[in-house]
Amino acid sequence: MEINRIDSYDDDRFDKEVLKQHGAFLVDGQYPCSFRIVDEKTAVVGYHNYEGIEELIEEFRFYAEHITCFLDEQGNLLKEYPRVKIFDLELDQIQPSQFFVDEDKLKAVASFVRVPEDVVIPVMRMENTNQYISQDGHTRMYCACQKGIRTVKAFLVGEENDYISYFVKEARNRGIYKISDMQVLSHEEYTEKWHRFCDEYFSSREQD
């Protein structure tokens, strides 16, 4: 099974709400699968065949581990995991692991980021500090910061690893210590600079 996540906010195969929640996936290049988050722990799964749905759920939870209860479109339980603790976190306590914000993506998320509950992010504790490292959700956090939102919702995803440590070190070398320090770039420049940085890093790891 080949599973690809849809990063666009404009795709006629999926409901707008699903796209905003990053819950759209394409299976084997042709079968749409949607995850519509309905509360802080539950998502409704839309798919043509629920056999083997667990692999799709696991792929979705790679990006949204805080969602632990999955229902089909008739409300029947498909899969349930132990609940994940979600807590309030000050934006200024969060060390980014990225450097740039995509201007187009920022405009898109601005339409639905209104309150802290709209931003739920995976974080890691930063050693020997009261800071946390953000693993994802940088655009939503930057948007929240722009709108004067001071706290977001967060959940822990494990301990700092080598690649996150390197990305954080690079961020700090560039003067990025909090979300508001990140640089907004055009979509084209973001794609070129961020993808090049990631490609070069992971390519060097493969050669080690």
Regions found by a protein language model. Name each.
Residues E2-G23, N128-D208:
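Basic- and aromatic-enriched surface patches that contact anionic nucleotides/nucleic acids
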Residues N4-Q135, C145:
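Short alpha-helix boundary/capping and kink motifs at helix termini
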